[in-house]
């Protein structure tokens, strides 16, 4: 029997489980997002199946790309557990978090090449705003090799009721 899926706000005590279950290596992303959460910049969300983390997302309280809404970003569900409702659960939880803070909507930035993610967001009611932005970042793979990436992002939004 598969353990129930839950989504909640990450806590510092979750760091060891996050590093084991969703390793980010030299990027140390979990620690960085927890620090930004402590500073009030973001809310770090984790989906759990039992005591195993199976996905993450970040609500940035200042949206990018000209959005007046907070933005759900860094949504990640590992390929072995995709198409099991985890991404959808994280999106809905992010909407609830934004709504609980009195926000009128939520934005999601999606890389123009990520057709599968865009289809999910559109199925959930998100609408392409026509706004675009380009961002660059660096990440490190398991071997420690550095990779520079550039994303061409389109902004989708959902008005929250």
Cite the ranges covered by each PLM segment.
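Short glycine/proline-centered loop/turn elements that form peptide/ligand docking sites
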Residues: 87, 91, 113-117, 133-140
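Conserved GNAT acetyl-CoA-binding A-motif
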Residues: 98-109
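Conserved acyl-donor/pantetheine-binding loop and adjacent beta-alpha core of acyl/acetyltransferases
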Residues: 56-69, 134-149
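Acetyl-CoA-dependent GNAT
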Residues: 3-5, 9-80, 91-93, 97, ...
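Active-site acidic-Proline motif in GNAT/NAT acetyltransferases
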Residues: 78-80, 84, 112-113
């Amino acid at each position: 029997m598969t353990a129930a899926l839950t989504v909640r706000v990450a806590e510092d005590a979750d760091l060891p489980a996050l590093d084991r279950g969703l390793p980010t290596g030299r990027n140390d992303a979990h620690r960085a997002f927890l620090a930004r959460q402590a500073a009030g910049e973001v809310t770090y969300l984790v989906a759990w199946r039992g005591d195993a983390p199976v996905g993450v997302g970040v609500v940035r309280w200042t949206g990018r790309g000209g959005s007046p809404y907070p933005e759900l970003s860094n949504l990640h569900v590992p390929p072995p557990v995709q198409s099991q409702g985890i991404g959808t659960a994280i999106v809905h939880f992010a909407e609830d978090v934004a709504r609980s803070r009195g926000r009128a909507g939520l934005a999601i930035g999606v890389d123009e090449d990520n057709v599968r993610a865009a289809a999910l967001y559109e199925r959930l009611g998100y609408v392409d705003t026509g706004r675009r932005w380009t961002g660059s970042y660096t990440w490190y793979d398991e071997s420690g090799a550095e990779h520079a990436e550039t994303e061409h992002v389109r902004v989708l939004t959902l008005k929250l009721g």
